[in-house]
């Protein structure tokens, strides 16, 4: 879905560039205009600083005021240096040379008068379409346990769902993601802000792990006798 969106946005951008050659774009009523730079869809495109410079200059000419740079896609890998998470160095067979990706975005954007906000997907750590990410490589215990019509299973088994969400109540993951966030702002204090996505449970089917049951029973002060049916029940 994101790839389709990026292709559509790219087409609209090309059309807009052709229409605006001799015009000075104006931001409506001083409202911010945001351009989103997806991590996975643009991995090869933004593989060198010159490409970043080119697109930032283009969006500036179109009147955009903010660049939203995706630095933690749904795999849980990141696009900045940190000791707390693996760095995404390859996507779909393309290996990116090592450079300060986010740092260059910030430097060039600020030269152009554009704000930079880093975007991070929070309670997710895997891509189910490619069996890739932290819940596949190192931390399967972080994956959300979902209650489906077929029974209780790991979200990594739901191959029609691309985001392998984690259990937000998992304290080990909470420590992990907080370390990632704190290290990001420590390393890049000139960031203008953060945008946090997927700060939630996967949905009504999550989370039905033993951990969630224990935490819920401690919260209400009694045992759940029929689990998961006392929470909700699928009807055929």
Per-segment meaning from a language model:
Residues 51-77, 189:
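Catalytic domains of carbohydrate-active enzymes, especially glycoside hydrolases
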Residues 74-121:
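Aromatic-lined substrate-binding rim segments of carbohydrate-active enzymes
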Residues 29-46, 118, 123-188, 231:
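Active-site-adjacent "subsite" loops/lids of carbohydrate-active enzymes
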Residues 59, 67, 109, 177, ...:
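Conserved, mostly hydrophobic/aromatic
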Residues 79-91, 124-159, 198-235:
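Aromatic- and acidic-residue-enriched segments that line the glycan-binding/catalytic groove
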Residues 33-37, 67-69, 116-118, 194-196:
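Hydrophobic faces of well-ordered beta-strands that scaffold small-molecule active sites
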Residues 1-4:
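Positively charged n-region of N-terminal signal peptides that target proteins for export
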Residues 18-19:
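C-terminal motif of bacterial Sec signal peptides marking the signal peptidase cleavage site
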